[in-house]
From Swiss-Prot:
Domain of life according to the entry: Bacteria
Gene Ontology MF, one: glutamate-5-semialdehyde dehydrogenase activity
Reactions performed catalytically: L-glutamate 5-semialdehyde + phosphate + NADP(+) = L-glutamyl 5-phosphate + NADPH + H(+)
E.C. number(s) listed in UniProt: 1.2.1.41
HAMAP family, sorted: ProA (MF_00412)
Compartment annotation: Cytoplasm
GO cellular component: cytoplasm
Coiled-coil stretches noted in the UniProt entry, renumbered to this chain: none
Name this protein carries in UniProt: Gamma-glutamyl phosphate reductase
EC class name: oxidoreductase
Any GO BP annotation: L-proline biosynthetic process
Length: 436
């Protein structure tokens, strides 16, 4: 790992950029809600005006990436169509429609006469986001950062440098034209800078990596800055013996092929032995006709799956049109397999038995547990968050798709009238602890 990534100390240029973002984030944290909404609309306007420039930059990035032989999965994420760009721009505007996450009172309590405690949400500060390929992520991340009163330092994959630069140029112009500090958004373009970010604990409050398993794990192990993210997206779908067959086929297909490069696409399909033959005799030709390479255990091979799986296949995130299939004896075996190999991202069950569904959803320890629906719904936009900055598979919150609510923390505000603890110790004053 250390041979692939190194963590150099930040140079003066990076330190200056980080300080500019830090100072801008302080200003934005004090900005009124309506001004942050105004900024988002201005950012969207500038993106629209820069459509031609952005798409031309993306075409150049895509052509260069093809010549370098970049994988199909990364090429798919890199490509920015006009429709995808327009959708991203609309997403920036929709983030402005979401409720203000800042200055929300979570607790208001009278501790004693004249002593009032409040717990209120506040921006985190500066976000450091490292991601691969997807230039549309720049729009999502930046809009969520500004909406929640944070600054952001962005580092995308080098294959998208031209596209990301064009997008950030428009976003910064939008900030400036709205009256906010354009330095709240900063794009880094070198790998050295992205690794040096890990040593910016005096400037960055949260690192959000969105990339390969190897990159995410390295970041988690090599920074003192808190990290929000997931290293793998090994998602499962279990077809129970009491599943509706047509539903199972439809959901399984959507969960795999709707966008196979997504982290919420399934990598393993588990099938109850009592329904395996009737299900697979329809599923195998269905997946084959959609160019999905099927890999299975011995029992599935006997039923027509072409390639036999190894243990490695059960713990591989393909991000491609490849699917591992395993036949299990019962619900318990399905759950045990998931608990052993799942990355705790999203796992689902197809069944008409509500008791089985309830047990599956209560026992499987993943950020998302789904019943009778596609795993592809595990997404901040589809959850109604407006957009997501990432997905967290950690047990402590935030967990799952992270939108605005995951980009604020809280402070305790205590207002008194000369109150001192000694009065309570001596009995001169008493605590009332009354919620207001």
């Amino acid at each position: 790992m250390a041979n692939i990534f190194e963590v150099p100390q930040p140079g003066n240029d990076l330190l200056e950029k980080a300080d500019q973002v830090r100072l801008a984030s302080i200003k934005i944290s004090q900005t009124e809600n309506h001004n942050r909404i105004k900024a988002l609309n201005s950012m969207a306007d500038c993106l629209e005006k820069s459509t031609k420039e952005i798409l031309e930059a993306n075409n150049e990035d895509y052509t260069r990436a093809q010549k370098k032989g970049i994988s199909k999965a990364l090429l798919s994420r890199l490509k920015l169509s006009k429709e995808k760009l327009n959708s991203g721009i609309e997403g920036v505007r929709k983030v402005g429609d979401l409720a203000d996450p800042v200055n929300q009172v979570q607790i208001k309590r009278e501790l004693a006469k004249g002593l009032i405690l409040e717990r209120k949400t506040v921006p985190i500060g500066v976000l450091g986001v490292i991601f691969e390929s997807r230039p549309d992520a720049v729009m999502q991340i930046s809009s969520l950062a500004i909406r929640s009163g944070n600054g952001v330092m962005l580092k995308g994959g080098s294959e998208a440098n031209l596209t990301n630069t064009a997008i950030v140029k428009a976003l910064k112009k939008g900030l400036y034209e709205s009256g906010l500090d354009k330095n709240a958004i900063c794009l880094l373009t070198s790998r050295k800078d992205s690794m040096s970010m890990l040593n910016l604990e005096k400037y960055i409050n949260l690192i959000i990596p969105r990339g390969s398993n190897e990159l995410v794990k390295f970041i988690q192990e090599n920074t003192r800055i808190p990290v929000l993210g997931h290293a793998d997206g090994i998602c499962h779908l279990f077809i129970d013996n009491e599943a509706n067959l047509e539903m199972a086929l439809s959901v399984a297909l959507d969960s795999k092929i709707q966008y196979p490069a997504a982290c919420n696409a399934i990598e393993t399909l588990l099938v109850h032995k009592d329904i395996a033959q009737v299900f697979l005799e329809k599923a195998i030709p269905l997946f084959n006709s959609n160019d999905v390479k099927l890999i299975g255990d011995k029992r599935t091979v006997e039923l027509g799956v072409k390639y036999e799986a190894s243990v490695e296949d059960w713990q591989t995130e393909y991000l491609d049109l490849i699917l591992s299939i395993k036949i299990v004896d019962d619900l318990e075996e399905a759950i045990n397999h998931i608990q052993k190999f799942s990355s705790k991202h999203t796992d689902g069950i197809i069944t008409e038995n509500s008791t089985s569904a309830k047990k599956f959803m209560n026992v499987v320890d993943s950020a998302g547990v789904f019943h009778n629906c596609s795993t592809r719904f595990a997404d901040g936009f589809r959850y109604g968050f407006g957009a997501e900055i990432g997905i967290s598979t950690q047990t402590l919150p935030p967990r799952g798709p992270v939108g605005l609510e995951g980009l604020v923390t809280y402070k305790y505000f205590l207002n008194g009238d000369g109150n001192i603890v000694d009065d309570f110790s001596s009995g001169k004053a008493i605590y009332t602890h009354k919620d207001l």
